[in-house]
Amino acid sequence: MFFLETSGRSWLTPREACALESAAASSNLKVNIIFLSDFVDLYDNSTCSIMKLLPNVSLFTIKLKNAFEDTPLYRFYQRDDFRNSSFKAVHMSDALRIALIFKVGGFYSDLDTMTLGDLSRLENVIGSTRMRGSGSHLANGAFHLDRRHPLLWRVMRGMVEVYTGRERGEIGPLLLTRAVRQHFNVSDLKSVRREGLHVLPSTAFYPAKSEVYIYPINLSL
């Protein structure tokens, strides 16, 4: 199971530590957190606690050149429109998760999640969700795909083709949804099941509606 810290920080926030702890405690999977920073600050309290308490959690750093090499995204992260984008961290996260799972296979999850059950039996699954104004679509916050799954190659090619750097979500969930429909030649996402990819209902990975999300940074006490 893989998590990504793409902001450039070398430590975990308490909320991120909770995501790792819940994943490590609820699942039989080995949990890996990958940082884009040059080093990991093991003296930070949250990071240190995770390493001491959870033996099935490992921390790594990664070089972008190695992550994107031999994929359609190899030149992507060097483009001017990517380097100058106001949403660089978001776009890096969207791209890196796809390249990583393409290369190694496995389960990916965002760092703002809580794992409440064993994920080790889930294979080739993507969760659906609903977004105001766009209806039902697939989300890229939690998914499992096999190593070198051809769908992931199509997603990466789509990223390169549509990227402008001007829209926050242009290579995120809606692109993933289009890629799945094109790859399996279906209009109804429920029809994908017979093709070896299981689309899970929103209650599986995204039970909370976006309207009830709480953003602590905006709270005034």
Task: Label the predicted regions.
Residues 1-93, 109-221:
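Glycosyltransferase-associated regions of secretory-pathway enzymes
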Residues 94-105:
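Small-residue hinge/turn detector
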